[in-house]
Curated annotation (Swiss-Prot):
InterPro entries: GreA/GreB_C_sf, TF_GreA/GreB_CS, Tscrpt_elong_fac_GreA, Tscrpt_elong_fac_GreA/B, Tscrpt_elong_fac_GreA/B_C, Tscrpt_elong_fac_GreA/B_fam, Tscrpt_elong_fac_GreA/B_N, Tscrpt_elong_fac_GreA/B_N_sf. One of its GO terms (biological process) is DNA-templated transcription elongation. The keyword DNA-binding applies. Residues 53-75 form a coiled coil. Necessary for efficient RNA polymerase transcription elongation past template-encoded arresting sites. The arresting sites in DNA have the property of trapping a certain fraction of elongating RNA polymerases that pass through, resulting in locked ternary complexes. Cleavage of the nascent transcript by cleavage factors such as GreA or GreB allows the resumption of elongation from the new 3'terminus. GreA releases sequences of 2 to 3 nucleotides. One of its GO terms (molecular function) is DNA binding. It comes from Sphingopyxis alaskensis (strain DSM 13593 / LMG 18877 / RB2256). This is Transcription elongation factor GreA. PROSITE patterns: GREAB_2 (PS00830).
Length: 158
């Protein structure tokens, strides 16, 4: 049974998922054509083109179902409408690490997360540690490379 839990995301993430869904739906007829063409080659038991096209069809249909589910449960959040002194979904947070090096992250949904772009999932170890914190709070995060310590220096809603 599908979950009814809301999926928080920014408008940018919603648009990205919508574009992915449209691209996959556009690919559907191409896959059907590839299956028909491969089927025309005869014996399906040893027809690699046919099996590859059927496998791709299964992947595309599964991804379409997943995207439609996420989009139907999406709760689009505009961080510019938020305020407060605590870190919440959508906030942009400046932290200082153990070497006094500032790092900046925005708390986003799982589908939008891209650490290199400064976007971390609210469900990630760091994201979970940040939610609810305030400026001057110290946090400890256990990541694969070990324990990291940060100081929250700024919270913005941009």
């Amino acid at each position: 049974m599908a979950s009814v839990e809301k999926v928080p995301m920014l408008a940018e993430g919603y648009e990205k998922l919508t574009a992915q869904l449209a691209a996959l739906k556009a690919e559907r007829p191409l896959i059907v054509d590839a299956i028909e063409e491969a089927r025309a080659h005869g014996d399906l038991s040893e027809n690699a083109e046919y099996h590859a096209a059927k496998e791709r069809q299964g992947q595309v249909e599964a991804t379409i179902g997943d995207l439609e589910d996420k989009l139907s449960r999406a709760q689009v959040i505009d961080p510019t409408t938020l305020s407060g002194d605590r870190i919440v979904f959508g906030a942009t947070v400046t932290l200082t690490d153990e070497d006094d090096k500032p790092v900046k992250y925005q708390i986003v949904g799982q589908a939008e997360a891209d650490a290199k772009a400064g976007k971390i999932s609210y469900n990630s170890p760091l994201g979970r540690a940040l939610i609810g914190r305030r400026v001057d709070d110290e946090i400890e995060v256990t990541v694969p490379s070990g324990d990291k310590y940060y100081l929250v220096t700024k919270i913005e809603f941009i």
